[in-house]
Amino acid sequence: MNNTEIIENASKVLEAIDAAKEEELRNLNSLVQPRAPLNAGSTPGEIINEIKHLSTRDQEGGTSSKDEEESGAGRTVAEGAATRDHKYSKSRPKKQPRSGLQSGAAGKNPTPDGEGGDTCNRELDQHSDGDGHSNTEGASSDLASIQPCQTDDAPCSSTSYLDEEDEPAVRPKTQCKQSGLIESKEDEDGMLSELHEQHKGRSKRLSALGRVNSSPIPSPRPDELLKKGIGESIVWSGRMTESLLSHGVIQCVPGSDRYQSGKSVSVADAHLNARSACWTQNKEPQCHITNSPSDTSTDNASRSELRTIEEEDYLQDDDFEQSIEDRDFDPGDWDPSDKHNDNGLLLQILKNQEEILNRLKTIGSIQESLDSIKRIQSKQGLALSTLEGLLSSVMIAIPGSGNPGSSVEINPDLKPMLGRNKNRALKEVSDELTPPNQFLQKQGMTIQQAVKPKETMFPPAIKTGESSAKGFHPKENLVSRTVINSIITARVNNPELAAKLKLAVAKAQTKEELERIHKSIIKNLKN
């Protein structure tokens, strides 16, 4: 069900509710303007006409047999009849009713014709409610005491003789006279049946909602099932086109009873005749046809005949290619009866496609490997460029023998470093004591040339009187005083002694005093 159908159903329900509200308002307005009440001298015919008018007004206003109107009409009739009976009971003396008439009114004194003594006894007006149970309500319950009777001997009256104190229980007294509106017994019976039909229907206030609620929820037919997924991931779902609304509330989606998980599918759930094609390499194709699922007598036999296709029954790659070459795919020569012969080819195609998909999944990992290689290559290029920049500013100084007569150009931008080769960058780090003798070199004589390193190539010697890594020698400055105070704070644990030493450092004026304080502190810490 799509959203459009849901919105349409919801709008229909809202319209039905609005129509029911309007009908209820019209009924209330009609009840505000009642007719003139019945007086004490109303006849049974007038009472019946009043009830008929009320039921007709209910039908015109869109409602029938409402409990409120029926109870109101019953109370009006009962009050008028009770008032009249109370008036007659006061004006006339109390009499005991005849036993024959009393039994005849109750239907217990049979006549020669085989019927009750009360030939004009009317059945109570009954109407069925919404559940089909017969109930006597409203005016019918109050008119149960109004039973006009007419015997063969003389007219009689069915009265209820009670004390005057029991006024609420007094029933109306009617004369057994033929009313001008009732000409015959057939007309009376017809009118009573008409009243019975008028009061039999149930209320139409929410009839539109009843129609919506009564709409059955359709079950998915086999031809409307949709297959989603391949292999074992199969889900069957039906298309629901009918309304699933109930009183404006969207119901939950009903669960599907036709779902079969995995490959455990029974033959009874097959929509058509199930066929299974079996292919082998050197055999003709065989097909086992099962019976229809509706035939219950052969259901077990069809299940035993149905077999699954094993992997070794599939066509191999060579056989598949050979079968493709041998077959003629002319559409005019294709026979629908050979449909089961193509099942093996289709299975092989699906198998090949699955293998291709599995291989295509490795493309992602290959792409990730290529990206990592590119990142490593960029890092290596950056490292090589850095080393190249460092090597361009370095001169390797290799002490040793070489060509002493070679002229060397001194590059002040290069930094000398030690190496394994000899005679390279030697003139930058050494001084020649004696110039080379060209005459002796021409005669082939080996001359040892004296070489002295430059003094600037060695670091200066450590001075004993100055502070260095070898030792601390205080001076007359703020830095030396701060160093001594730091030593006192870190090494002296006695607070009183530390305070005295800091006070002595502050009072020292000469270099000798600071040295004496420093030596005493170091000596005490060593001990």
From Swiss-Prot:
Compositionally biased intervals (Polar residues): 135-161, 285-301
Keyword line: Host cytoplasm, Phosphoprotein, Viral RNA replication
Keyword DNA-binding: no
One of the record's GO cellular component terms: host cell cytoplasm
Ranges for region Multimerization: 312-400
Disulfide-bonded cysteines: none
Disordered: annotated span: 29-225, 285-319
Regions that span the bilayer: none
Bias kind Basic and acidic residues: ranges: 49-60, 120-134
Domain notes: The N-terminus consists of a long intrinsically disordered tail. The central part contains the coiled-coil multimerization domain (PMD). Forms a four-stranded coiled coil structure. The C-terminus constitutes the alpha-helical domain that binds to the nucleocapsid (N-RNA complex).
Protein function: Essential cofactor of the RNA polymerase L that plays a central role in the transcription and replication by forming the polymerase complex with RNA polymerase L and recruiting L to the genomic N-RNA template for RNA synthesis. Also plays a central role in the encapsidation of nascent RNA chains by forming the encapsidation complex with the nucleocapsid protein N (N-P complex). Acts as a chaperone for newly synthesized free N protein, so-called N0, allowing encapsidation of nascent RNA chains during replication.
Subunit organization: Homotetramer. Interacts (via multimerization domain) with polymerase L; this interaction forms the polymerase L-P complex. Interacts (via N-terminus) with N0 (via Ncore); this interaction allows P to chaperon N0 to avoid N polymerization before encapsidation. Interacts (via C-terminus) with N-RNA template; this interaction positions the polymerase on the template for both transcription and replication.
Family: Belongs to the morbillivirus P protein family.
Protein name: Phosphoprotein
Organism: Tupaia paramyxovirus (TPMV)
Lineage: Viruses, Riboviria, Orthornavirae, Negarnaviricota, Haploviricotina
